[in-house]
């Protein structure tokens, strides 16, 4: 199946590059669009929704580190990135909103295989929330 718009959900860890590489390898043969999203679940009480990184007045809401990391991932992707998004709040809801708004048909996300991920898995939450195809990539920390 050829996907038309792939959304990569990144946590901005060094392993995020693996997700970008995987999505690019799937998008390139079909000239599919790729977008990046980072959802900060730590500030859910402050703001819920999407912020387009390209909008000047909204950039103030995004930490400089997050903006820099998303820009670096986008620049080093080796493939055009259509949208670079940052959101806050419930991970599943922010992704569902982005999927609807930008007509995405595949979500690529990572799953850290560590102790904490066994207790609180973002991937498990997404499986029960997102209604498009998903690719869950197992990630290992760089020091392993």
From Swiss-Prot:
Q: Which UniProt keywords apply?
A: Cytoplasm
Q: Which GO terms describe its cellular component?
A: cytoplasm
Q: What is its main location?
A: cytoplasm
Instruction: Report the subcellular localization.
Output: Cytoplasm
Single GO biological process annotation from the record? response to stress
Specify whether Transcription is a keyword of the entry.
Answer: no
InterPro entries, alphabetized: Rossmann-like_a/b/a_fold, Universal_stress_UspA, UspA
Domain of life, per UniProt, equals: Bacteria
Q: Which SUPFAM superfamilies match?
A: Adenine nucleotide alpha hydrolases-like
Keyword Nucleotide-binding part of the UniProt annotation: no
Give the similarity note.
Belongs to the universal stress protein A family.
Q: What does this protein do?
A: Required for resistance to DNA-damaging agents.
The protein's assembly and partners: Homodimer.
Name it: Universal stress protein A
User: What is the scientific name of the source organism?
Assistant: Salmonella typhimurium (strain LT2 / SGSC1412 / ATCC 700720)
